[in-house]
Design a protein with these regions (language model features):
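Metal-dependent nucleic-acid phosphoesterase active-site entry motif
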Residues: 1-18
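Active-site neighborhoods of divalent-metal-dependent phosphate/nucleic-acid chemistry enzymes
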Residues: 67-113
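Short helix-capping/linker segments at secondary-structure and domain boundaries
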Residues: 14-20, 51-55, 101-109
Length: 136
């Protein structure tokens, strides 16, 4: 499964009391290759979990792989920030939108379906998503 990991998935995977924990665990069992992500997502996840060490271990253990160069994509990130200014996307979301453009065969794993249904890659393409079932 070729995918890009958002913060909410990582937090749900780690926290047994998260409403999406069982979904994240089930999905995690089916992952056969590292999930791509970016530093902004790792920083958010470490903040929400209160543990940089746990997030670092996910990278060290090969569940997550950093696959984004912020500096090389600064112009595109700035354009995305302008395009979605009314939605006030955080930096991690902007990076994930751009990663989806760079890795078009990858779906974004997120619990934040509402925002990602609004965002578009390459200006008009919907971003393929893997989300928890409705009501979960």
């Amino acid at each position: 499964m070729k995918s890009i990991a958002d913060t909410g998935f990582i937090v749900a995977f780690a926290r047994s009391n998260d409403q999406h924990h069982l979904w994240a665990l089930d999905l995690g069992k089916r992952i056969t290759e590292p999930l791509l992500t970016c530093e902004a997502v790792l920083a958010e996840a470490a903040f929400h979990l209160g543990s940089s060490s746990y997030v670092l271990s996910l990278v060290e253990d090969g569940l997550l792989r950093l696959a984004f160069d912020f500096s090389e994509n600064l112009g595109q990130l700035r354009e995305l920030a302008r395009r979605y200014a009314d939605h006030k996307p955080d930096l991690a979301d902007l990076c994930l939108i751009r990663m989806s453009e760079l890795h078009p065969r990858h779906a974004v794993i997120t619990v934040d379906e509402a925002d990602f249904r609004v965002y578009r890659r390459n200006k008009r393409e919907t971003i393929p998503l893997i989300c928890p079932p409705q009501g979960n």
